[in-house]
Amino acid sequence: MEDEAVLDRGASFLKHVCDEEEVEGHHTIYIGVHVPKSYRRRRRHKRKTGHKEKKEKERISENYSDKSDIENADESSSSILKPLISPAAERIRFILGEEDDSPAPPQLFTELDELLAVDGQEMEWKETARWIKFEEKVEQGGERWSKPHVATLSLHSLFELRTCMEKGSIMLDREASSLPQLVEMIVDHQIETGLLKPELKDKVTYTLLRKHRHQTKKSNLRSLADIGKTVSSASRMFTNPDNGSPAMTHRNLTSSSLNDISDKPEKDQLKNKFMKKLPRDAEASNVLVGEVDFLDTPFIAFVRLQQAVMLGALTEVPVPTRFLFILLGPKGKAKSYHEIGRAIATLMSDEVFHDIAYKAKDRHDLIAGIDEFLDEVIVLPPGEWDPAIRIEPPKSLPSSDKRKNMYSGGENVQMNGDTPHDGGHGGGGHGDCEELQRTGRFCGGLIKDIKRKAPFFASDFYDALNIQALSAILFIYLATVTNAITFGGLLGDATDNMQGVLESFLGTAVSGAIFCLFAGQPLTILSSTGPVLVFERLLFNFSKDNNFDYLEFRLWIGLWSAFLCLILVATDASFLVQYFTRFTEEGFSSLISFIFIYDAFKKMIKLADYYPINSNFKVGYNTLFSCTCVPPDPANISISNDTTLAPEYLPTMSSTDMYHNTTFDWAFLSKKECSKYGGNLVGNNCNFVPDITLMSFILFLGTYTSSMALKKFKTSPYFPTTARKLISDFAIILSILIFCVIDALVGVDTPKLIVPSEFKPTSPNRGWFVPPFGENPWWVCLAAAIPALLVTILIFMDQQITAVIVNRKEHKLKKGAGYHLDLFWVAILMVICSLMALPWYVAATVISIAHIDSLKMETETSAPGEQPKFLGVREQRVTGTLVFILTGLSVFMAPILKFIPMPVLYGVFLYMGVASLNGVQFMDRLKLLLMPLKHQPDFIYLRHVPLRRVHLFTFLQVLCLALLWILKSTVAAIIFPVMILALVAVRKGMDYLFSQHDLSFLDDVIPEKDKKKKEDEKKKKKKKGSLDSDNDDSDCPYSEKVPSIKIPMDIMEQQPFLSDSKPSDRERSPTFLERHTSC
C-alpha cells in the first residue's frame, strides 16, 4: 500500500492526448539557476493506523467524492496553496539527516565524453563539456573551451534522465581497480538482469574501451602546428560520402585493435594546468554518451565505486573516478543523448544532489534526488528567453545550506561561527562575544585571554610563511615610517623638540615590537594619535607657564595613567566594550578615515604654498621675469671677518674680501646662500619654483589611483590568476616604486623623505631617561593623577574601539581576541615610554584596518566562473613585529629612504583613508541620499526599515561626526575621548526615536550577507511553524505519501526513447493515469 500513489479523481476527465509536436515543444523549455525553498517540516511519529481508522478514512474519502463541483473546486484551490512536502523531499531528509562521522564528500570534477568519429574513420570518446561549479563547453571549432556559464537544461532531458535511472542499471559501492574490469562488471550485470543480449557483449565492451580524446590547453606553437592537420581532417570529413553511416560506424568499431589501457595517468594529464582549479581531494564523475548501430534499446548504467580509482586516461585531469554514467543508444537520437548527459553532469555539480549521490543506498534515493532537483528548478518560457544565450556566473551564489538544512534536520545550524539574530529586540553590540564576558574575578579576563592565546603562540610565527606577509610588511612599514615622521615633527614643534622625530622612531619601534610579540591581537598597529598630540601640547604649555619640568610631570602622569589602566584590566572593565555598537564604531572609524584624507590634501596644499605656481608666467615674455642676488649695504654688515664663504663653484674667501672685492659677482650665489650671507633677492620671480607643485600632485594622485587600480587587479581578465594575485598583494609597494622611478627620471626636485641620521635625543637638554624626582615640588607627583584620569579615558577609548573594529566578525578571525591582554600591554608600554620620554602609543584605526586588508585570504582553488571566497585573515605576529623592527632600523637606512618623495607617501595616506571606508554601512547610507529609489541596492535594512527612518539615522550620525570634527579642530580637543564616550549615550537616546526593530537593522555589527542569511532562516522557521499547524489540521496523516505531480515519460512521448514499442493499452488506461498524477 505504501508504494501506491494517491488517486487523482480528475484524471478520468483527461481527454487530451499529447501529439508529437507538443512533445518536441518540451525541448524548448529551459531551466535556470534554482532558488532554494525556505520551508521545512518536522518529522512526526505516528502510530500505525487501525482497521477502524482505515474504514473511517474510506468513508471520508467517499463523502469527499460526493461533494458538489463548487465545493471541490474551493477545497482544491485552498489545498493547493498549502505548502506540502513531497515524498522526494521526505526521502532526502532521511538521507541527509543520517548521522555520519565520515568527512564531507569531496569536490567532484564531471566530464562529458561523447562517442564521435575522428577524421571520418575511427570512433573515439571525445570530451565535449566539463563541470566543477559551472559548465564549460568545447566550442564548435574544437580548439578552445567556452567561458564558464550557468548550465541551462531542457526540461524534457531531466524527465528522460529520471526514466534512465528507473530503467537502467544502478550499481552502488562496487569495487574495481581498472577500466577494463569496471566495464566487464557493468556489461555482465546488464546481461544478468536481461537488459543486454549476450551476443552484444564484445561490441559494447569494445565501444566502452575506445580511446579518450581530451580537450587540453595547447601552447601557441602547438596550436599553429595543428592548423593544417585540422583543416585537412575537416575536408576529409565533408568530402567522404560514407561518413556517419551505420555500416561505416560498425566498421570503425571492429577494424582497429583495442587500445592498450593503462591505469596510470598520462603525461598530458599530469601537465594539465586545470588541476590548479581543483582541491587536492577532488574526485571525478565521468559521463559517457553516444549512439551505435548495433543496439535496439538503450544501454544505461550508473556506477558508484566503493573507493575512487585512477582509470588511466578516462579523465582529463589525473583525479580518481568515483562515479560513472553510461548511455549508449540506437542511432538517430544523438542530441537527446547529449542533453541527458548534460543533465546528469549538471546534477552531479549541484551540491545537494552531489551529497545524495554519495549517500544513496539504492535506486529510489537517486530518483528522489532528481525529484528534489525538479522541485527547486525555475522554468523559463521558451518565447521569452533564447537558450543559446550563455548566462554569466553570478558574483554570489545562492547558498545550498538552506536546502541541506531543510532536509538534514538542523534548525539552529550556524555557519562560520555566526550567531543568531536577536530578532529585533536589541541594538546589536557584542553581548555574545566570549572575550567580553565579565568573570567577576580578579584579573579573570586577563587570565582567560592568556589561556585563549597561548595555544596559538607558535602558530602565530609559522602562519606568516607566505609571500603575502612580505607585501604586508613593506606596505605597513612605509605607512608607519611616514606616520612616525609626521607625528614626530608635530611633537617637536609642540614641545620645543623635547620629543622629536628620533624619539618618535624609537618609541614606535619599541612599543610596536613588544605589543605585536605579546599582545592578544597582534594585527593591531600602535601609533601616535591626534588626541595624544593635543594633550602633549597643552601639557607642555601648562608646564612652561608654571615653571614645571615638563618631562618629569609627564612621567608621573604616565605612571598614574598606567596604574589606572591596570586597574581596568584587573576589574574586567573591557566588558564595557559590548556597549560600543555599530553607531559608535562607524562614527569613530569614519572620523579617523576622514582625518587621513583631509591631512593628505592639507599637506599637499601646504606644499603648494611653499612651492607656488607662477600663474602669470608667459612663455613669450621670459625677459620680464628675473631674480638677482645683490650685496647688502656695507654699513649694515654684521658678519665677523673670520667667516669664510665657500660656494661649491667659487674659491674660498673671507667675508671681508667678499664685501669689498668689486670683482666678486653675487649673482652666482643660490637663493639659500644669498639669504645665509646677508644678500638681498631682487626680482619678480624669486618665489617661483617651476614644476615642483604640479609634479608633486602628479605623484600624489598617481600613487593613489595606481594603488586602487592594482589592488582591484585581482578581478581583472588580464594575466593568469597567480600573477593577478601577486600584483594585487604588492599593489601599494608597486605604486610607490613606479612613482619613485618616475620622479627620478623627470628630475624635478620634489620634497623627499627626511630620516634622522644620528641616534641621539633631538634636544641637547634631555637624556634617554627621566629622573622621577628633583625638578618639581613633591605634590606634583600626586596632582598628576588628575590629568592622568583624562589620559586613561583617552587611551581606553582609542585602544578598545580600534580593537573592536579589528575583531569584527566579518574578518572571520579564528584565534580569538584579547581585549584585556591588549590593554595590559598598552599600560606597561606607557610606563616604558614615560621613563624614556618617548611618545605614548595606542592602537591606530586606519593603519590597523590596512594591515588586516593586506593579510586577507581567499580560496586558492576556485572553480572556473566562481568568485574566490573570503576565508579570513592571516593571523600572525611576524608582520607587525618586523614592521616595527624595520622602523627602528630606519635611522641606518636613511641613504635609501631619502629617494622617496613625500607626495608619494601622502598618496598612500589618501589610499589608506579611502580604503578603510569600504564596506562601512555609514558610507552606504550616505550614498542612498543621492540615489533614486529604483537604483538603490538591495540592502537588508531597506527591506525592513522605511527610507525616511534610514535617512534620519544617517543624519544623526553625520551630525555627531560634524560635532566631533569641530571639537577636534579646537583647543577643546583634549576632551575628544570623552565625546567619543558620549556617542554611547547618544546611541542610548536613540531608543526613544527609533523602534528596537529599526535599530536592530540599522545598528548591528553583523555583516550584511550574514544578516540576510539569518533573515531567511527566520522566514524558514515561520513557514515551518505554519506548515506544522496546517498538517495538524489536515485529514491526510503525514505517514502516508503526500500527493505529488509526476509526469511519466510514457505519456510525454508516443514513442519513448527507451523502447521502440508503442504504449500499451494498460498505459492508456485510467488506472495507469491515476497512478502517475496527483490530486
UniProtKB/Swiss-Prot annotation:
Reaction catalysed by this enzyme: 2 hydrogencarbonate(out) + Na(+)(out) = 2 hydrogencarbonate(in) + Na(+)(in); 3 hydrogencarbonate(out) + Na(+)(out) = 3 hydrogencarbonate(in) + Na(+)(in)
Non-traversing membrane segments, not crossing the membrane: 961-986
Modified residues (Phosphoserine): 61, 65, 68, 223, 232-233, 245, 256-257, 262, 1026, 1029, 1034, 1044, 1069
Stated consequence of mutating T49D: Loss of conductance regulation by cAMP; isoform 1
Reported impact of R554D: Prevents membrane targeting
Residues recorded with modification Phosphothreonine: T49, T249, T254
GO biological process entries: bicarbonate transport; positive regulation of glycolytic process; regulation of intracellular pH; regulation of membrane potential; sodium ion export across plasma membrane; sodium ion transmembrane transport; sodium ion transport; transmembrane transport
Effect of substituting H851N: Prevents membrane targeting
UniProt subunit comment: Homodimer. Interacts with CA2/carbonic anhydrase 2 and CA4/carbonic anhydrase 4 which may regulate transporter activity. Isoform 1 but not isoform 2 interacts with AHCYL1 (via PEST domain when phosphorylated); the interaction increases SLC4A4 isoform 1 activity. Interacts with AHCYL2.
Functional note: Electrogenic sodium/bicarbonate cotransporter with a Na(+):HCO3(-) stoichiometry varying from 1:2 to 1:3. May regulate bicarbonate influx/efflux at the basolateral membrane of cells and regulate intracellular pH.
Name recorded for this polypeptide: Electrogenic sodium bicarbonate cotransporter 1
Organism: Homo sapiens
Gene this chain is encoded by: SLC4A4
